[in-house]
């Protein structure tokens, strides 16, 4: 039987709720989200429940990670549906601040990540993005004081940046990645998939198919540049405008060459119509 989770909208209310949990010696997992929850988010919640006694889900559409030309105003907001889904999963607490609670008057501090994880992927096309993400995630960690935080691998560069930040700043939070959840045709689940027209939705799984083919060729020892060239052609011929298709070191996201050892990850970002999609796959 589902029960409606408790909801905190102010920092003082959040601290009262968390103090109550901590008084019972409970471990806490945080699942940061921007709402518009889908099965990918629910998989994060379920992993959180396996890793901690209590689960906090934050729902906050963070304005500082959107550029003026991006979709902050139109980003899907489905509060009632989100609460119902989290109730069905028996989430303990929802942290749902507004922008003034997160960024009160006089707020001026910003975390700007650097390093090989910021080397020409999302940061090249969305230079504002990771400063906004790092700042809001650092705040969420400070506010919620979780033992563990669960992030999806679909946003793989974000996962690596947050992992590095938590380590570098001694935040005391174990960051755990959770595998990408896909539609039956391979499209990575995303809140922005609702923007796709019917025709675009039929084409969208091309991204995942191209990644699988590229990964297969690399595992078989195929030439990396030839495989990337063919993947690029597959994606653009399907009607996408390609931002990047890259093979990177899976942990540092530094560029790699054909003969380098170590784990590798293929990452892609492309636009179809007005919708920008990202995806990635392990080699």
UniProtKB/Swiss-Prot annotation:
Task: State where beta-alanine binds.
Answer: 65
Q: Which cysteines are joined by disulfide bonds?
A: none
- What is this enzyme's EC? 6.3.2.1
One GO cellular component term: cytosol
- A single BP term in Gene Ontology: pantothenate biosynthetic process
* SUPFAM superfamilies, per database record: Nucleotidylyl transferase
Functionally, this protein is described as follows: Catalyzes the condensation of pantoate with beta-alanine in an ATP-dependent reaction via a pantoyl-adenylate intermediate.
How does the annotation summarize its subunit structure?
Answer: Homodimer.
Please report the name of this protein according to its UniProt entry: Pantothenate synthetase
Q: Which organism is this protein's natural source?
A: Bradyrhizobium sp. (strain BTAi1 / ATCC BAA-1182)
The gene designation is panC
């Amino acid at each position: 039987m589902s029960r409606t989770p408790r909801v905190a909208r102010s920092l003082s209310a959040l601290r009262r709720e968390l103090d109550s949990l901590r008084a019972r010696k409970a471990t806490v997992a945080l699942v940061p989200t921007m709402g518009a929850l889908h099965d990918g988010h629910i998989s994060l919640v379920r992993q959180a429940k396996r890793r901690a006694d209590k689960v906090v889900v934050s729902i906050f559409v963070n304005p500082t990670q959107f550029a003026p030309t991006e979709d902050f105003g139109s980003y899907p907001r489905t509060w009632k549906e989100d609460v119902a889904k989290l109730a069905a999963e028996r989430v303990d607490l929802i942290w749902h601040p507004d922008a003034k609670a997160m960024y009160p008057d006089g707020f001026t501090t910003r975390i700007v990540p650097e390093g090989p994880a910021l080397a020409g992927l999302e940061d090249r096309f969305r230079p504002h993005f990771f400063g906004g993400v790092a700042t809001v995630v650092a705040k969420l960690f400070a506010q919620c004081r979780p033992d563990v935080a669960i992030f999806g691998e679909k946003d793989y560069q974000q996962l690596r940046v947050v992992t590095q930040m938590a380590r570098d700043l001694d935040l005391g939070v174990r960051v755990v990645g959770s595998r990408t959840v896909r539609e039956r045709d391979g499209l990575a689940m995303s809140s922005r998939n609702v923007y796709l027209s019917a025709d675009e939705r039929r084409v969208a799984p091309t991204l995942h198919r191209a990644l699988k083919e590229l990964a297969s060729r690399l595992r078989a020892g195929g030439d990396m540049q030839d495989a990337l060239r063919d993947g690029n052609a597959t994606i653009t011929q399907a009607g996408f405008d390609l931002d990047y298709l890259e093979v990177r070191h899976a942990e540092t996201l530094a560029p790699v060459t054909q003969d380098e050892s170590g784990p590798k990850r293929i990452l892609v970002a492309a636009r179809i119509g007005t919708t920008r999609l990202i995806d990635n796959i392990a080699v």
